[in-house]
Amino acid sequence: MANGCYAPHGIGGDLMEPRYAVLQKVRNGKRTYGVTPHIPGGFISSKQLIKIAEVAEKYSGILKMTSGQRIAILGLDAEDVPKVWEELGMEPGVKSLNSVKNVHMCPAAFCKRAKQNSLKIGMALDKRYHGMEMPCRTKIGVAGCRNACTSVYARDLGVIGDKEGYMVTAGGSGGFTPRVADIIIDKLTEEQVFLVVDTLMEYYKANGNMGEKLGDFIQRIGLDKFKEDILSKSIY
């Protein structure tokens, strides 16, 4: 389970809310919650899938496939949330508001269109960054070809495979004020991808203002400066 360095109770840090749960509705004074276990890249074993279904049925929850490649259990009573997490035995999908929420991944090696088996990179980024505290909520997208079926250009950070290597993008958003990501560099090797991404994340974490999306940060300091600082500290 997640450690205690994140939001102590509700995802927003509200002491009155159950830990790692999102308030859904208040109807006639009754509050219901949703929980979302972490499923890296949307890949799940049959045993995990059965466990989620069994726990949801036991606590009268409703299952919902999410846009983040996860399965949410909705309609839970507050007192049942801790029991649900204990019985699932899985990491929370979202650990705090301003953190890396997920790493979207395409099927890659399972897709005939893939130019690179980007799953290795996606799983490594998930292991390295999921739940890490950032200036603002952060989403990562990884795709094995330029079709970018994980909406990479709408993610804060993206990695796209191509015949000539990998491309890294940054600053995308599909939220209230959509923004298309900027291409930071292309034709990277797998090793170079990690150098660039690690440098980019550290740079944003150190210099971004609290609550400032990566795209807004890039606009504030300028794309040219952002690219120069990232690339000079990573591969140039």
What are these regions (language model features)?
Residues C5-P8, G61-S67, M134-R137, A206-R220, ...:
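Flexible, glycine/charged-enriched surface loops at secondary-structure junctions
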Residues V142-N147, D216-D224:
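A glycine-rich phosphate-binding loop feature that marks nucleotide/adenosyl-phosphate handling sites
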Residues L23-G29, Y59-M65, S173-G174:
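Short, flexible, solvent-exposed loop/turn segments with mixed acidic/basic and small polar residues
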Residues A2-M16, I221-E228, Y236:
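Charge-rich, low-complexity segments
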Residues I11, M16, H38, F43-I44, ...:
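Conserved active-site/ligand-binding neighborhood in enzyme cores
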Residues C5-Y33:
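Intrinsically disordered, low-complexity polar/charged tails and linkers
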Residues A2, G144, Y153-K213, K227:
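Mobile "lid/hinge" segments at catalytic clefts and subdomain interfaces of large enzymes
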